[in-house]
Design a protein with these regions (language model features):
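C-terminal, non-catalytic "cap/extension" segments appended to globular domains
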Residues: 140-142, 385, 430, 454, ...
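A well-structured
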Residues: 60-316, 321, 589-590
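C-terminal motif of bacterial Sec signal peptides marking the signal peptidase cleavage site
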Residues: 19-22
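Catalytic zinc-binding patch centered on the HExxH motif and its immediate surroundings
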Residues: 311-312, 345-368
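Post-HExxH zinc-binding segment in Zn-dependent metallohydrolases
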Residues: 283-289, 408-437, 442-445, 449, ...
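Short pre-active-site segment immediately N-terminal to the catalytic Zn-binding motif
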Residues: 366-385
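Catalytic Zn2+-binding segment of zinc metalloproteases
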Residues: 390-403, 423
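Bacterial lipoprotein signal-peptidase II cleavage site
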Residues: 24-33
Length: 591
């Protein structure tokens, strides 16, 4: 099955995905930049106005009569032909002025010159990548600094990106239905033509709902930074935000012809080849494992050991760690790590100074993946940096066919990250020394908890989105009941408020089950590595090389000899769970 959906409602979902915080698109791109003889209104990022500027760059009125376009050389050196040789420190965001973009898009619909239409299309695509990159840079600044100005900038750049995408899609659709229909369709390709030939611009209501989503997400981020509110007060306000998001998203799903937002998100946001019903069946089937896990594993004494210097790493040491192990993954992984380090395409810092997040995104104008991870000063820093580097590796080696419409499987993206976590287990003697046993328990526990928590939050979200009239008190109660059904003990009222600290509930609904699905695949890689590490590493690199754009999760696993949870859950999980339980019980018996 090709991961391609050709419908207006899917394109609208793709626009929404570009605005999801914390799970940015991982699709590098970039090509030679065609430009009009009239200078574009927004300068290349490396020559833009200083970062955190809320003022658009000054522009002259667009001179459409000065077209046709001419081609110019790529603005960036790309020594490998793909990734720009630009340091992150030289990338700056600013507010893009849409004047020329809108005028050029209008021109695409009416030109009768085949050469001009092609040049306009290429220029618009490049400018769209620029706008997307400016939005990503603004969000990175927000997570790094969290000022009110950064918050306002994110809302502004999100709105610009949404407007630019809608304008671009509509312009391409008009050209596909215009006087140059056949020639233009041949130039942009069959996939693009099928996807956009019937595109309709967003209605005012759609735009209003999507902009409201951004506003509410920013309110949520601002709320979590407050220290003057009690936990119940925080939960109440977060609940109000979540329930308004649920209302807006349910309305959008109905506009696009879906019965439920879950159906819409599974198909159109995340490119899944399994359904919400399949996920619900997984949630039910995982509960016996979860009850055993919370009884025998979750409170293992190994988690309470101070690992001290064995687990502590500075940001520089974490980058060096990746530099040491990346060549043992593959030459391509080593190249990705060297590119990241050479150009400073990462932010690692204490959770006391930056937002508590881990993500990898792609700065599309530069085809440059960027890794962000907040640090706790413990073992999780090492595990999470391997996790995020799995995403980075994939983003570096895999480019989508088309930046506008290619949509990958987010479940497969997460195999790239959790799979590397599973393989790093084999290096723990070297990394942790005499604390390797505790580290191994932590690693397996983390992957197992990914599965359980992925199910918990998917079940929670499916309930909330199907009961939009519930109150905040009911929200807390339902979450607590779901935890109990998995065997989780509720030690205090605070446990019922945990959902508010998971940003995915607000920013990327129905994403969390991807952690469960991916870990079920990655634990199979871990099991293979127990008996033949080279074979397991070869399998992992094969998975990464296939990317996430051509096959869905279930299809991909079957094609490489792994088992999908939709076929046999025990085959995915039984060996790894038994190993974790045995390790925990043995460790506790010695304590």
């Amino acid at each position: 099955m090709k991961m391609k959906k050709h419908s207006t409602r899917w394109i609208a979902a793709l626009l929404s995905l570009l605005l999801l915080a914390g799970c940015g698109a991982r699709d590098p791109g970039g090509a030679a930049v065609p430009a009009p003889t009239a200078a574009p209104s927004s300068a290349p990022a490396e020559t833009g106005v200083p970062a955190a500027s809320m003022e658009p760059e000054p522009v002259e009125e667009p001179e459409i009569e000065r077209f046709p376009f001419v081609y110019v050389a790529d603005a960036f050196t790309r020594s490998d032909g793909v990734h720009a040789d630009v340091d992150f420190a030289d990338m700056e965001w600013y507010l893009y002025d849409m004047t020329d973009f809108t005028a050029v898009a209008d021109r695409l619909a009416v030109t009768d010159s085949e050469e001009e239409a092609q040049a306009i299309y290429d220029w618009l695509m490049t400018e769209y990548l620029r706008i997307s990159t400016l939005d990503e840079l603004a969000w990175i600044d927000f997570y790094a600094y969290g000022t009110e100005a950064d918050q306002e900038a994110c809302q502004a750049t999100d709105e610009l990106l949404l407007t630019a995408g809608d304008t671009l899609y509509a312009a391409v659709s008009d050209a596909l239905n215009g006087s140059l229909s056949r020639e233009f369709s041949a130039y942009v390709g069959e996939e693009m033509s099928e996807a956009l030939s019937d595109y309709e611009e967003m209605s005012d209501r759609e735009m209003e709902l999507k902009n409201r989503e951004t506003e509410l997400q920013l309110q949520y981020n601002a709320l979590l930074s407050r220290r003057d509110l009690s936990e119940p007060e925080l939960a109440f306000r977060a609940g109000e935000i979540l329930l308004e998001l649920v209302s807006a998203r349910n309305e959008l799903a109905q506009i696009y012809g879906y019965e439920t937002f879950a159906d819409y998100a599974y198909e159109s946001y995340y490119g899944r080849d399994y359904t919400p019903a399949d996920a619900a069946a997984l949630c039910k089937a995982i509960k016996p494992y979860a009850r055993r896990y919370f009884k025998n594993c979750c409170y293992c004494d190994a988690f309470y050991v101070d690992m001290g210097s064995a687990a502590e790493r500075t940001p520089e040491q974490l980058i060096d760690l990746l530099g040491y192990y990346a060549p043992r993954i593959s030459p391509a992984a080593a190249e990705a790590q060297q590119y990241m380090e050479r150009h400073g395409l990462y932010l690692l810092d204490s959770v006391d100074r930056i937002a508590e997040l881990g993500f990898t995104t792609t700065l599309k104008l530069y085809s440059a993946p960027f890794l962000y991870n907040s640090l706790y000063g413990n073992i999780y820093d090492i595990q999470s940096v391997f996790h995020e580097f799995g995403h980075y590796y994939d983003a570096y080696v895999n480019q989508p066919e088309n930046q506008m419409i290619s949509m990958g499987s987010y479940d497969v993206f997460e195999i790239h990250s959790t799979g590397l976590e599973a393989l790093s287990y084999g290096w723990y003697d070297e990394i942790f020394g005499d604390r390797a046993e505790e580290a191994r328990i932590n690693c397996l526990d983390g992957l197992m908890y990914n599965i359980i928590s992925g199910c918990i939050y998917d079940e929670f979200q499916q309930y909330v989105y199907s009961h939009p009239d519930m109150t905040v008190d009911e929200l807390n109660s339902v979450y607590g009941d779901i935890l109990s059904s998995y065997g989780r003990k509720l030690w205090s009222l605070s446990d019922r408020y945990e959902w508010m600290n998971v940003s995915h509930n607000f920013e990327s609904p129905f994403y969390y089950v991807s952690y469960a699905a991916s870990a079920l695949a990655s634990l199979q890689i871990w099991a293979k590595a127990r008996w033949d590490r080279d074979e397991a590493m070869e399998l992992y690199n094969d998975l990464v090389s296939r990317g996430a754009y051509d096959q869905g999760y279930c299809e991909l696993l079957r094609s490489v000899g792994l088992v999908s949870f939709t076929d046999d859950l025990d085959a995915c999980l039984k060996e790894a769970y038994a190993a974790l339980e045995e390790m925990c019980l043995r460790y506790d018996s010695r304590s």
